[in-house]
A protein has these predicted regions:
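Intrinsic disorder/low-complexity segments enriched in polar/small residues
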Residues: 3-5, 24, 32
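Short, non-transmembrane amphipathic alpha-helical segments
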Residues: 116-138
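Hydrophobic membrane-insertion alpha-helices, especially the h-region
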Residues: 10-21
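Ser/Thr/Pro/Gly-rich low-complexity linker/stalk segments immediately outside membranes or between
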Residues: 26-41
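Polar/charged, Gly/Pro-rich intrinsically disordered segments
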Residues: 24-26, 55-111, 135-185
Length: 185
């Protein structure tokens, strides 16, 4: 009998608590807060679909400026700027290119591939030039600088230095420390 009474009291208390809880929930207000949305039209929308393909495009003006600056450091060196992105290819064969990032390639002929101190100092000089390019001349986000240290056609060291990583983590490094920070044989 005692158990039955405890069960009844438990059920009544639970039902009362549930009823009170439901009564204290606030109903949604009639004033809905809607955030302002800014719509920016970039191109006229066409219903035509396209196929996306990774693509590269040359950046002739940026290439000339960087190549000239690199040749001032070493007349045997060369540099090239490339835009990386996507081609949107339509069914009629036409296409549009969307830039994702700007990448660079810098080549330096060398006599000895063990001069890591000199290579690191070269990287520092080139990265200082690249990071001083006005941001409005860089399309998309920062990409990378690919360094080629070439002894001959078969003997070379090639690796990439992500520009933003250099700015964030390595701009104060030089010499062998900078070289080894990015070169992973």
């Amino acid at each position: 009998m005692k158990n039955k009474r405890n069960w009844i009291i438990g059920i009544v208390l639970s039902a009362t608590a549930a009823f009170v809880a439901l009564q204290t929930v606030n109903a949604p207000s009639s004033e809905a807060i809607t955030p302002e949305v800014e719509v920016i039209a970039s191109e006229t929308f066409t219903n035509e679909t396209c196929a996306f393909m990774w693509a590269y495009q040359d950046a002739p003006e940026l290439t000339k400026n960087l190549d000239d600056a690199v040749k001032e450091l070493n007349p045997d060196a060369s540099a090239k700027a490339t835009l990386f992105g996507e081609d949107c290819i339509y069914s009629d064969g036409s296409k549009t290119f969307g830039v994702i990032e700007t990448d660079f390639t810098v080549r330096l002929p060398v006599g000895d591939l063990t001069q890591h101190e000199e290579f690191g100092n070269w990287i520092k000089q080139v990265m200082d030039i690249v990071t001083e390019i006005p941001r409005e001349e860089i399309q998309g986000k920062y990409g990378f600088v690919e360094f080629w240290f070439e002894k001959n056609e078969n003997e070379k060291i090639t690796f990439r230095v992500p520009i933003q990583k250099y700015i964030d983590e390595a701009k104060d490094k030089s010499g062998v420390e900078l070289f080894e920070y990015f070169y992973q044989p």
